[in-house]
């Protein structure tokens, strides 16, 4: 269930790029921009990127986007911990959920049976301390950041016209190298995050997501500004390392509890 929420939110984030690319506001963004969205969301992102690029020796706007991504993701670590704990609780509950599913069988044709099944499943999740929305908060928070970053890049002349490596940050990668890297890191990141899922039904669903999500990233990356694709890549790499570290910490905590 958690994976379904994540898949929907990731899909919405990617769809956001497609929609934004067709309705981008060309008005330059600066400290005098008005409106809640421009002044409190887009401009702060633009300011952060410009500040890093201008004040850190050797930094470019590409490096500034990478640093800004790392800062944002680091600030979201507490939410990631909550997300991982939620995933661990869901894994522990799988045997009980499977028993419940076997008890009721196919409930699609019996409304009363379906209601009872949903009620018992909700009670089981509540007793296990699992909240399906806990794992979605990092994605929910990233969506406005994602949108603000798009506008910060496209509406800040200095960022939009700057280059990093072989790409112009305000335009799509002409060689499609960054979108391919973004798709590959998305695939690997999903494999790492989902490697402790055990149920057969989940495995089939996750295999489908592991194909669909990177494919969507690749498709959107062909049209997205290179600065935004750079944000995806950096975020994926950070999430991979974060998941590996958190998994080790959680496993150590579980071993200590078993020994106590």
Curated annotation (Swiss-Prot):
- What InterPro entries does this protein's entry cite? YidC/ALB3/OXA1/COX18, YidC/Oxa/ALB_C, YidC/YidC1/YidC2_Firmicutes, YidC_ALB_C
Q: Which UniProt keywords apply?
A: Cell membrane, Chaperone, Lipoprotein, Membrane, Palmitate, Protein transport, Signal, Transmembrane, Transmembrane helix, Transport
A Pfam family (short name) is 60KD_IMP
Where is lipid attached as S-diacylglycerol cysteine?
23
Gene Ontology cellular component list: plasma membrane
- Where does the UniProt annotation locate this protein? Cell membrane
Coiled-coil annotation: which residues? none
- A GO term for molecular function: membrane insertase activity
Q: Which domain of life is it from?
A: Bacteria
Gene Ontology biological process terms in this record: protein insertion into membrane; protein transport
Give membrane topology per the record.
Multi-pass membrane protein
Where is a lipid covalently linked (N-palmitoyl cysteine)? 23
Family the entry assigns: Belongs to the OXA1/ALB3/YidC family. Type 2 subfamily.
Q: What does this protein do?
A: Required for the insertion and/or proper folding and/or complex formation of integral membrane proteins into the membrane. Involved in integration of membrane proteins that insert both dependently and independently of the Sec translocase complex, as well as at least some lipoproteins.
* Name the record gives this protein: Membrane protein insertase YidC 1
Lineage of source species: Bacteria, Bacillati, Bacillota, Bacilli, Bacillales
